[in-house]
Design a protein with these regions (language model features):
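Extended recognition/assembly regions associated with phosphoester-bond processing machinery
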Residues: 1-76, 80-220
Length: 220
């Protein structure tokens, strides 16, 4: 399992290449912004069919991470569904797949701005969740400490010998972690955007996702 280990508020964590964060002591896998049903919502609103493969791709990667970690707890940090109508319109195959992934483990859906209400799937539905020194919620709050959130879909630009590439990234400073979007068809906000630059402290680091996740100083 390719990962990048780091400490946060005295807790040993690891960022996986997928953008998930793994808390081994709690056997907890944390992901954010799955945006399941995004292609359905795009088609519904625009009338233009979108490729319907994003749900399968996202759930496949989630299944792989669960298998690799043998997680007993899965926390989804909000915007797990692109909207509540998209959640209701999930194909039966996808609903059964989620049910299989939930079997034998605790599953927590944190409310997001795209999916603020309860959904017709198993698991607990919470506005936020505290565990030890950490608090899990969808959107970062000013002044928070030990906060793990998502929402902003952070990404960084990485120079290579050939060109500059853009990759999703886990942002970490002394107060908070912001996870990238886990879902397929999700865009991102560059770490040098004033919103993220304002949220993250001067010591912030970025863990660049991919086959070999690596920690760098957060680009500003």
């Amino acid at each position: 399992m390719n990962s990048c280990a780091f400490q946060f508020r005295g807790v040993p964590l690891a960022a996986l290449g997928s953008g998930a964060v793994w808390w081994a002591e709690q056997s907890m896998l944390c992901v954010s912004d799955l945006h399941l049903g995004k292609s359905e919502r795009m088609s519904r609103r625009s009338g233009v069919p979108a490729p319907p493969y994003e749900v399968h791709d996202t759930l496949s990667r989630l299944e792989d991470d669960i298998a690799a970690t043998q997680a007993r707890v899965v926390v989804c940090l909000g915007d797990s569904f692109d909207d509540l109508a998209a959640a209701a319109a999930l194909p039966e195959e996808a609903r059964l797949w989620i049910t299989r992934l939930q079997a034998g483990r605790r599953w927590v859906w944190i409310e997001g701005n795209h999916d603020p209400g309860p959904i017709d799937l198993g698991g607990a539905h919470l506005a936020e969740m505290e565990l030890g020194p950490l608090i899990f919620r969808h959107i970062a709050q000013d002044g928070a400490r030990g906060e793990v959130s998502g929402h902003y879909h952070p990404k960084v630009q990485v120079p290579t010998r050939a060109r500059v590439i853009s990759r999703p990234a886990v942002l970490v400073d002394d107060a908070r972690i912001i996870l990238p979007a886990y879902g397929t068809y999700t865009g991102g906000l560059r770490s040098d955007d004033p919103v993220l630059a304002g949220l993250m402290g001067p010591e912030a680091r970025a863990i660049v996702t991919g086959a070999h996740p690596v920690m760098v100083a957060m680009p500003r």
